[in-house]
Amino acid sequence: EDNLFRPFADHISIDSPQFFNRIHNHSTWGNAAVGMIGLVMGDDELVERALYGIPFEEIDVAAKDDDGGFIFDKDGRAGFLANLDEPFSPDGYYTEGPYYQRYAMYPFLVFAQGLHNARPELDIFSQKDGVLLKAVDALLNLSDADGEFFPLNDGQKGMSYQTASLVSAVNIAYLVGGEDPRLLGIAEEQGKVLLDDAGIAVALGIRDGKAQPFDKRSVNLSDGPDGSQGGLAVLRQGDEHLTLVFKYGAQGLSHGHYDKLSFSLFEKGDEVLQDYGLVRFVNIEQKGGGNYLKENTTWAKQTIAHNALVQNETSHFGGKYEIGSQHHSELYFYDDANS
């Protein structure tokens, strides 16, 4: 404990405050790691550090992370609970987009399950009106007919709910969220379960014939911590014969793009009208570990790269993150009666 786990937890947090404290999907992993170490060792200080971040007197509240986004939220909060409150809307939409929500759901739900078991008084799955469970439902609805997530913001194409993080999310949400039989339908498609109490619950539910199809529907998900920063609309015709994805939300933190009115159109999972996403050497270790190219900012994030109107030959908000993050689109009407 003293020679490995505590030094490791300190390195993740105290030695790296500008990353541990930020509101970002990467930080959720750090929060969860420190918190899980604290839960196992019975170290309340580590658990508190994970939940609320570390003091930031020596860090500029306006400082940015290596992705160009602000480290703290507007109120200067940090830690796991801040990452639960700030990026998620009341509907469970994650402002960075479904690709990054998929990545973050593992630490969110695994640490939450640990808190649920070891700190029941925190009632973590009821935080923000049960937003973690809503997030699983929202994320599954943000996939096409093939189960692949819509590539919003910097989202990589081809990532689906077959990934390990979604197996965990579906299993845990089923166990602690009232055993929604629709989740069993997704679990059947995934074809695997966790080797724990959540996985056993899912396996038994499928064995007992409780599974129901997860019928993806037209949805209009709000964006922003209080749901007032625009949103994301998905209009589906029939059995996903046609699916329109219309983004009119907030910036999307550091992974967001300078477009507030972009759209994509799918036919049975195939792109008919695509919306440009990212420029990245995915999984090519020799290329900076598979990082983003500079063209991700100079081209892919700009409004001209999207299915959005460009005025005066310039990106929305001049392509400036500080300005774009202060603004969002407004919803005037939404009607899916014919879908």
Residue ranges and their predicted role:
Residues 91, 149, 306-308:
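Generic secondary-structure boundary/loop-capping signal
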Residues 91, 154-156, 259, 275:
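Acidic side chains
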Residues 41, 57, 115, 146, ...:
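Generic hydrophobic alpha-helical segments
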Residues 184-339:
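Catalytic and substrate-binding regions of extracellular carbohydrate-active enzymes
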Residues 1-133, 137, 143:
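Aromatic-lined, polymer-binding surfaces characteristic
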Residues 123-199:
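C-terminal, helix-dominated tail/subdomain
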